[in-house]
Curated annotation (Swiss-Prot):
Segments annotated as LRR repeats: 123-144, 180-204, 258-284, 329-351, 352-375, 389-413, 439-462, 519-543, 551-575, 579-603, 632-656, 728-752, 806-830, 831-855, 895-919, 927-951, 955-979, 1013-1036, 1044-1068, 1138-1164, 1210-1232, 1424-1444, 1445-1468
Lineage: Eukaryota, Amoebozoa, Evosea, Eumycetozoa, Dictyostelia
Species the sequence originates in: Dictyostelium discoideum (Social amoeba)
Record's keyword annotation contains Magnesium: no
Protein name: Putative leucine-rich repeat-containing protein DDB_G0290503
Region of interest called Disordered, as start-end residue ranges on this chain: 1272-1292
Family matches, as InterPro entries: PH-like_dom_sf, PH_domain
Pfam families: PH (PF00169)
Amino acid sequence: MSILLEGYLEKQGEKGIYKSYKNRYFSLAKNGFDLHYFESPPPKDVSFSSSTQSSTALSLGYLDIRQVTSIKKVDGNFVFHVEVPGRVYILRAKNDTEINYWIEGIKDAIKYHEINSSQVQVLDGLIKTKDNDIIKLREKIKHLNEKHQESEKRYQEKEKKFEEQRTIEIQETTKKEQEIKSLTLQLSSKDESMKSLEKQVEKLVDIEHRSEIEQTKKDNEILKLTEKIKEIQLIENLNSTNDSKVNQLLEDNIKRLQESLNEIKDENNDLQSLIDTQKQQFEKRINQYQLEIQDKENELNEMNQQSLSQVKSFQQSLQQSQLDLENDKNQFSTKLQLVNNEIQSLKSIVDDKLKEIQLKDNQLTQLNQQHEIDNNKNNQMILELNDNISKISNQLNEKDNKIQELSKQSIDKQKEIENSTSSSDQLQLKLNDISNELLEKLNDINQLSNKLQDKENQILEINNKLNEKENQLISKDNQLNQLIENNESSSDELKLKLNQLSDELQEKDEKLLNNQSVINELQSNLNENQNKINELIENNQSSSDELKLKLNQLSDKLQEKDEKLKSLESSIIERDEKIDQLQDNLNEKQDKINELVENNESSSDELQSKLIQLSDQLQEKDEKLLNNQSIINELQSNLNENQNKINELIENNQSSSDELNSKLIKLSDELKDKNENVRSLETSIIENQDKLDQLIQSNQVTVNELQSKLNEKEININQLIENNQSSLDELQSKLNEKQNEINQLIENNQSSSDELQSKLNEKHQEISELQSKLNELIENNESSSDELQSKLIQLSDELKEKDEKLKSLDSIIIENQEKLVQLTKSNQDSLDELQSKLNEKQNEINELIENNQSSSNELQSKLNEKQNEINLLIENNQSSSDELQSKLNEKHQEINELQSKLNEKQNKINELVENNESSSDELQSKLIQLSDQLQEKENQLKSFESSIIERDEKLNQLQSKLNEKQNEIDQITENNQSSLDELQSNLNEKQNEINQLIENNQSSLDELQSKLNEKLNEINEKDNKINELIQTNESLSKDQQSKFENLEQELEEKNNKILDLNSQIIDVNHQFSEKENELNQLQLKLIEKDQEIENQNNKIIDINNQLNEKEKEININNDNDNNNEENIQLIEELKEKLQDLENELNLEKDTVNEKNDDINELKEEIKLISEKLSEKEQELNEMINDYDESLNEINDQKDLVKSLNERLTNAHLKINEKDNEIHSLSKEGFNEIQSQLNLITNQLSEKDNLLIEKSQIISDLELQLRESYKERSSSSSLHQQQQMISPDLSNSNDELIVEKEEIINELKEKNQQLEQQLQDLCQQFNKNKQENELKCQQLEEENDGWKNEIDTLNQRLKTQSLNTSPDSSELQQQLDIISNQELNIKQLEKELQDKSGKIDNLEYQVEEMNKQYHIDINQKTNESSEKLQSIQLEIDTIREKYFFAIARSLKLQGAQMGWSMSRSIFDMFDEIKSLNINFDEWPIWISNQLEK
């Protein structure tokens, strides 16, 4: 902003005896403080932006407004004085308006330079004095009102005399009154329209106020962010050793800065758009107000002229009547006229003065409140305009009433004169009556009627008084002209302030852009610093030199701040003097106001009543506006809900990926369990090789185990299928939800674009916020993937990639703001890609399912092969039994004696064979049943696959709809793809392991078959042992058959339960599908109703637009009364329509809310159903776990020996001893760490105390400097200042610099000592940590040795248990003892893990203490450096003031001596800075330069 001051003034010269005035053209330079004067106006090409450029041949000289101490106005000849240190400029203008223009312009320029200062306390005194003056004015107004009331009473007493004559002419007056009422109705209608506009302006001002408050908050946030950036830079310079930690801190801070800056940019853009629109509306309305006010003023002037003409005719008629009546009536009429004129003039003057006072109060508040209270200024200015408009309207109404009264009086008096001419006798009688009444009421009037001589004397006195009052009126007219000029100047000030606000907004925008550029530069600098960290480690010596250079830079900054402090002190002194002048001027103006305001009180009561009416009307319109705002808030809440839904969708995607990972982990665990079961089978087969008698039993056991495993695998397959189904159903439901939500979003966006065209900027801001949030989510996903990978080596590369991504994102945001149309196209393309990626993921899931199915098929084929092998074994057994029978028959023939015995034995053998055959037949039938069941399940799988294919088709259709939105999920999907690829690779590895295990099992089975064949040959050799084997086989076969039957029953029960659960799950799925259909229908209905509501909202907006247009037409066509009435009727009809539409909207909103409640209830039912499903799945899992436990109990019945107990007890004792050692070591390490931390805290507290003492020393130095400056400024002459200041300054500067260097060196030394102590502590801690780790490793190795020994013992016991048969009770006791000991071992392992965790926590605490210590050191060093900079700035300001004081005094002396003085002071000051000359030599150097 720039202030304009231009024009001709007469300037008095300073040379010569006779000082004449010369006409000079004055113009204010662009810098706002150099007032140049010329012989004629300079050409436009010449720029006078500064004093150095203006020192050319064109400019005769200039006046520095910053150094002006006072402006005095001389009484006569339009002369005023401008005082500057060392000189007084005597200037003369042509009239008072030019004087006021130049004085107020200079004051405005001074205030413009004082706005940015923070001296608010000085101006509080002015506000208090003005408040006191206002209170005094109110008291004086009360006195004037009392006098006015007395005069009114007198006037009323005189009016009673003429009431008899007025009764005749009441009819004529009533007609005129009706006409006046019609006019008043028109005015009231206009006033109402004005009030409505005023309320809208107030609302706009409130919006501006809120927006500017938010802007101030964001400015504060920007300042905080810049401070954080400085802290980060200092941390980089100081902590070059901690590279990894610094990188992490820099990443976090950069992310936060970018997020906050993006938000601030968006909000500032919105605020600027709102402010621009509101300014335009406000300017239009102000122009309308001004036009209406001018129309009303013209009407009032016409009415006043008519009334004056009537009064003149009345006076002429009165002069023709008798002398007595003429004298009385002339006196009365003249007094009335004078009083009315005085009241009117006083009202106008008082209103203008009140306006000036209010404007000046606003100016003072503007000076007190800096940038944060600028917004409140606009509100106050608008409120003042509204008050003035209301006052003007009230005054207009009052004047109308008075004009009506005067018209009535004039009519009455004209009729009185006519009656007097017609009947003089009646007049005489009436005069007698009037004289009698006057004698009773007024002694003065009785004396006038009785004594003509006294009346003549009184007439002469009255004439003298009239002359005096005419002189007063002339003076008041002059004052009114001055007030009008002041009003014009105040209006110019308002315009200037509006321009200031716009310029400030532009400056803030520029600052934001600068901040963005600074942040980008910081990012580039950070990337460069990361590359240079390794170089800094190698070049520690060069870093110390850089620190010294930085200290020199800090000292330069301190000098600059000292210069600023000096300039601030000079401005404070100048302000004090200017404030005193302002107080004097205000006191003078207030005295004049007190003289003018003595006859004005009745108008205040009427104004108050009308103000109350206006306030009531304003409240009614405020309520209507609040209703509209509530509607807008509801729309905004809907937008926020849509944003929340998008965020929930993203979170659901992440959760689904996590669930897939967990399921894959569970599958891997199940595979491991299966591998362990296979190994247990191998051990059981090896154990059964020793006993040939139990071959049949072992075969049956293997068959049972295979069947159980088949069942387990079938259950697992079913679980996989169910899990896949549930996951697919969940995905489908989520996709449906997403589709519905996206449809709602699309419809809401379309409706909002139609309804809220004026709020496009806010929607752009919302889009940018969503983009920032998605960027945050992307960054979080990237960070999570980095943590999973745990690859710290790739951090530097990833940082570079992130920086590039951030830059690309910034460019994308800028492009999106410029081209919104391109966004939609890019969204569609990206969503198409998303759809393809989702299809790929679904294909991958299908491949996984197919792989699982293929693995299950392979397992089934292998089981079938094993079953065939078992059948071959049974057939071999049958063949061997047949051979035995043939041999027995041969022996029968050879041995006749033993036939009977052999027959008996043969019968027994035949029975056994039959039993075996029956058992084998049963087994075969069961195997056939199992195969049938497998085929049924295969059919189920095929049907399930077909259903999956159908669902896939549906999903593809749904995904085609999703292609329209969700551009921002690309990066998330890429991360998920990478994780899925890794999981797939892990699955492939595990599948390979499973295949290897299966091959190993096949090889082991082949070996077993070969061994079995060998042992069958041995059976033929051992015929003698057949009898014993038969007996044992009988007993064992019975036991095994009973067990087998029990197992079959359990299996059948469990299968029945599983079938029941499957049926229940199917029913629940049907219910779920039905509920989903209902939800979809409800959502469609809701969409339709939302469209209807949007259409109705559009209608309401159209109607509002029509209303606004009609109101504008009413304002334009104020003269046409009939048109106004028609428009009013139309407005009322439109308002009724609006109310009806609003009621319909409310009803539809209620219906929508009810449907939303129904949807929520359905969702709750769906949740309950899902919970029931989860409970049933848990029951299935429990059944399966129970079955697994029963099998494990059968396999875990093994024999153990008492020797194991002794060894385990010894192991227990050793472990306890080592635990005690670990505990003692950890306590010692913890105590050492605590003692070291206590030492560090004590050292930090000592350092804090030292810093506090140093800050006190610095504050004392500042006080000494200020006191010395005050003492020197109070000296009388400039020469004494030269002698006294220069040596003190040199000494003080040297002392301060020495003290600063000493303080900095001490701080450096103490920082180095503390860092060395911290390094020593860290080394000790690392040593203790390494020792503890070595001890823990030793303990773990010993524990592993014990475990290996226990395993070997277990294997030996197993082999021995085959040969021995201990009692079941002893076995159970030994098993219990072993299980207890294993639990104890596990507890010990847990304790070791907990202790290792505690050690890690201690390490983390120590690292945090180190970080906090470095942060505290940096903060304190920053504080000390800031204080040093402030001291240096003060010193620089003192130097600058000293230089300019000497240079100006020498320049004045040289001018008196006749030197040329062509050299500018500012150039000399720039040279002396670079030369480094002592203070003592400055005057000599300056004088030499001036002489050149």
